[in-house]
Amino acid sequence: MPSPRPRGSPPPAPSGSRVRPPRSGRSPAPRSPTGPNTPRAPGRFESPFSVEAILARPDPCAPAASQPSGSACVHPAFWTAASLCATGGLPWACPTSWLPAYLSVGFYPVPGPRVAPVCGLLGFGVTGLELAHCSGLWAFPDWAPTEDLQDTERQQKRVRTMFNLEQLEELEKVFAKQHNLVGKKRAQLAARLKLTENQVRVWFQNRRVKYQKQQKLRAAVTSAEAASLDEPSSSSIASIQSDDAESGVDG
């Protein structure tokens, strides 16, 4: 009959099996499961692209205590730029380098667009859709250089054609016969005088206007001369008065 074993002692190994003695007096510590929040052992290098490193990264869209409540997920650099502008760390303007790439798109290359305390970024919750409608966010200072629209809209002055004496004489001869020259005749005259059809057309148009003015002036002069012939002259009136006076004296 086997003797009773003491309490707490390990059970006897079966016959025929080899028993490995422990390497040390301490029992091996149980392995702890690796999780996303498990601290890494010092001295061990892990790749930042490993599964554990990716899972251990904090959510970039998690609400921070320094950002306004109810705001959308906005890059932290945007709030940093707005806070620096509001607290006086920078002047009224913040350069576009303080903003992330997706917010700085669309700025014109002028120094200092106004980004500082607009739409209550530090006091009220602003969503991503409201940022596009904020007045002053995309505004520019009054002294910013702007393109002069009047110069672009101003029509260029038409270059006046200089005709030589031979061309003017030929044009006057044709105008004396026909005041309006169109079609094939105008093309032939332009080719003969080494001019374009547009130049000939403009000359005839201006010549007709001049001719109408001359006709009106001649009509006015003719009417004035006719009126002067109908009225008695001052010398005839004086002679009539003197004759009346002499006849009165004789009577």
Swiss-Prot record:
Subcellular location: Nucleus
Any one Pfam family match given in the protein's UniProt record, by short name: Homeodomain
Chain positions covered by the region annotation Disordered: 1-47, 224-251
GO biological process: brain development; central nervous system development; dorsal/ventral pattern formation; embryonic pattern specification; heart looping; motile cilium assembly; neuron differentiation; notochord development
Keywords: Developmental protein, DNA-binding, Homeobox, Nucleus, Transcription, Transcription regulation
Compositionally skewed regions (Low complexity) per UniProt: 15-35, 224-242
Keyword ATP-binding: no
DNA-binding feature ranges: 156-215
Gene Ontology CC, one term: nucleus
Top-level division of the source organism's lineage: Eukaryota
Keyword presence, Nucleotidyltransferase: no
Biased composition range(s): Pro residues: 1-14
SUPFAM superfamilies membership: Homeodomain-like (SSF46689)
Gene Ontology MF, one: sequence-specific double-stranded DNA binding
Function as written in the Swiss-Prot or TrEMBL entry: Transcription regulator acting downstream of both FOXA2 and Brachyury (T) during notochord development. Required for node morphogenesis. Is essential for cilia formation in the posterior notochord (PNC) and for left-right patterning; acts upstream of FOXJ1 and RFX3 in this process and is required for the expression of various components important for axonemal assembly and function. Plays a role in regulating axial versus paraxial cell fate. Activates the transcription of ciliary proteins C11orf97 homolog, FAM183B and SPACA9 in the embryonic ventral node.
Protein name from the UniProt record: Homeobox protein notochord
Natural source organism: Homo sapiens (Human)
Lineage: Eukaryota, Metazoa, Chordata, Craniata, Vertebrata
